[in-house]
C-alpha cells in the first residue's frame, strides 16, 4: 500500500474552476479528436484524463478565448509527451524541430505525410495569437521551445539510462514539466515589461511553484511508473541517492515541498510596487502562479489520469494499492502509441 502525503493541506489558495469549462472543453476536445492522433482505445483513455479540466482549474479567471488556449495547450502537451516517450533522441529531435517550425510559421500549410504534431501545433498557435498580447506571445514561444528542447534531452537520458541526483533531476524537470509555457497563458491579456517580469521575486515565484508541481506530479504518478518500469520520478532519485525506503523518500519529498511553500510565501510578500497600473497586472499574474499548484492537485484526483474512478476516494484516504509490475514495451513507436487507463 502506498500512502500519499497531503502536500497541499496548508496551501492558502483554494479550488476554483472557470465558468466556461464545459463549453470550452467541448470545443477543444472536438478540435483535438479531429486529428485522430490516437487509436480509438487510446483516445478513450485520453478522454478520461480530462486535460481541459486541468486548464479550467489552473485558469479559473481566464476569459473564454484564453481558457480555450489553455485547454488546447494541455492537449498539445499530452500528445507531444505520448509521441516522444516511445522514441529515441534522434526521432524526438526531428519531431521537436517540426513543432518549432510550425509555431514559427502558424499560417503556412504543413507538408504532406508529416507527423501530426506539426499540424496540431500550427492550428493551436494560429488560434492562440489572435487574442494574445505581443509580450505573452514572445514569452510563450521562448518557454515552449525550452520545454521542447528538454523533451529531446529527456529522450537522450532514456537512451543511455542516465542517473540523476535530486539537484540535476529538478534542473531538467523545471523545463520538462511544461509549467513555464503554462504560466504564459496567465499573461495572454497582460503586458508586463521585461524588467519587471524578470525581477528576482517574480523569478522565485515561478521557480518554487514549478518545483511544487514536480513533486506533486511525481507523487501521484509514482504508482503507474513503478508498475511500468519508468524511473523518471523524484522518488526513485531520492531512494537511489540517499539509499532509503519509499516511505522515507515520500517524507523527504513532502518536507521539501513544505520548504518550497514557505519560500514562495516569502517571495510573494517581498514583491515590490511598480505603480497602480503595473501592480494590478503583476498581482493577477502572481495569483495565477499561486493557483497552479492547487489546480494541478485537484485535477490529479478529480480526473481519471492517475487513479481511474477512485480519485476522490484516494484524495480522502491518501492510500493507493500498489499496481503489479509489468514489462515496459520498448518496441512501441509513435504510430502505435498506447495510452493505458485504470
Swiss-Prot record:
Lineage: Eukaryota, Fungi, Dikarya, Basidiomycota, Agaricomycotina
Cofactor: Mg(2+)
Signal peptide annotation: none
Name under which the protein is recorded: Delta(6)-protoilludene synthase 8
Binding sites annotated in the UniProt record for Mg(2+) 1: 81
Site (Plays a critical role in the stabilization of intermediate cation): 78
Purpose of the protein: Terpene cyclase that catalyzes the cyclization of farnesyl diphosphate (FPP) to delta(6)-protoilludene.
The organism of origin for this protein: Postia placenta (strain ATCC 44394 / Madison 698-R) (Brown rot fungus)
Entry's EC annotation: 4.2.3.135
Gene: STS-08
Tagged with keyword Endoplasmic reticulum: no
Stated family: Belongs to the terpene synthase family.
Domain notes: The conserved DDXXD and NSE/DTE motifs are important for the catalytic activity, presumably through binding to Mg(2+).
Motif extent (NSE/DTE motif): 217-225
Xref: InterPro entries: Isoprenoid_synthase_dom_sf (IPR008949), Terpene_cyclase-like_2 (IPR034686)
Group of enzyme by EC: lyase
Residue positions binding Mg(2+) 3: 217, 221, 225
Amino acid at each position: 500500500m502506498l500512502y500519499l502525503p497531503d502536500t497541499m493541506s496548508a496551501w492558502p489558495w483554494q479550488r476554483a474552476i472557470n465558468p466556461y469549462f464545459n463549453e470550452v472543453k467541448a470545443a477543444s476536445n472536438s478540435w483535438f479528436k479531429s486529428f485522430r492522433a490516437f487509436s480509438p482505445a487510446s483516445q478513450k483513455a485520453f478522454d478520461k484524463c480530462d486535460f481541459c479540466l486541468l486548464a479550467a482549474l489552473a485558469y479559473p479567471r481566464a476569459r473564454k478565448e484564453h481558457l480555450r488556449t489553455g485547454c488546447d495547450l494541455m492537449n498539445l502537451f499530452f500528445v507531444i509527451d505520448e509521441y516522444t516517450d516511445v522514441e529515441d533522441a534522434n526521432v524526438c529531435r526531428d519531431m521537436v524541430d517540426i513543432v518549432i517550425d510550425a509555431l514559427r510559421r502558424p499560417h503556412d500549410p504543413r507538408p504532406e505525410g508529416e507527423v501530426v504534431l506539426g499540424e496540431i501545433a500550427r492550428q493551436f498557435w494560429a488560434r492562440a495569437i489572435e487574442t494574445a498580447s505581443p509580450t505573452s506571445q514572445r514569452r510563450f514561444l521562448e518557454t515552449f521551445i525550452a520545454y521542447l528542447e528538454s523533451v529531446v534531452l529527456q529522450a537522450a537520458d532514456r537512451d543511455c539510462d542516465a542517473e540523476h541526483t535530486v539537484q540535476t533531476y529538478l534542473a531538467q524537470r523545471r523545463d520538462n514539466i511544461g509549467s513555464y509555457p503554462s504560466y504564459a497563458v496567465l499573461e495572454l491579456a497582460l503586458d508586463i515589461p521585461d524588467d519587471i517580469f524578470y525581477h528576482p521575486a517574480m523569478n522565485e515565484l515561478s521557480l518554487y511553484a514549478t518545483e511544487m508541481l514536480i513533486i506533486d506530479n511525481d507523487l501521484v504518478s509514482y504508482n503507474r511508473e513503478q508498475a511500468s518500469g519508468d524511473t523518471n520520478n523524484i522518488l526513485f532519485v531520492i531512494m537511489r541517492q540517499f539509499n532509503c525506503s519509499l516511505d522515507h523518500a515520500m517524507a523527504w519529498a513532502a518536507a521539501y515541498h513544505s520548504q518550497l511553500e514557505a519560500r514562495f510565501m516569502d517571495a510573494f510578500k517581498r514583491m515590490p510596487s511598480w505603480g497602480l497600473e503595473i501592480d494590478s497586472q503583476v498581482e493577477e499574474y502572481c495569483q495565477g502562479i499561486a493557483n497552479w499548484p492547487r489546480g494541478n492537485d485537484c485535477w490529479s484526483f478529480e480526473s481519471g489520469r492517475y487513479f481511474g474512478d477512485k480519485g476522490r476516494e484516494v484524495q480522502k484516504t491518501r492510500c493507493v494499492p500498489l499496481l503489479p509490475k509489468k514489462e515496459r514495451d520498448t518496441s512501441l513507436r509513435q504510430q502505435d502509441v498506447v495510452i493505458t487507463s485504470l
